[in-house]
């Protein structure tokens, strides 16, 4: 009887199952994190381009702030950003230095609250509703010389 127990104890049956059970959640979390951060970077690129498009409209003579905001939100919509109306657009007039002189310019800043689809609920579950699950604000600024 003792020899049978010894063989069962030394047997490696089920070791692969335990190793997979320990490593699979970590690999799954790593894969989901890569996908989520890739998605966040794609949204950041769209927000940056929307700020640039807004600056292009803002430098034209006779445009209003509503024209700039409409163009930024239209670009966010075309970039398939969820809820583009949640983005805040700030337009300011400024001066920039060009060589030895200065020129009038328009500065457009776009702030967009980005929520992770998978990681945010997991963070809320693990951390018990702490600030880990709050949306990340993606900001982009574009400044262009007025025409």
Regions found by a protein language model. Give the residues of each.
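Alpha-helical transmembrane segments of integral membrane proteins
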Residues: 23-36
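N-terminal leader/signal peptides at the extreme start of proteins
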Residues: 1-13
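Catalytic tyrosine of NAD(P)H-dependent dehydrogenase/reductases that use a Tyr as the general acid/base
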Residues: 15, 32, 40
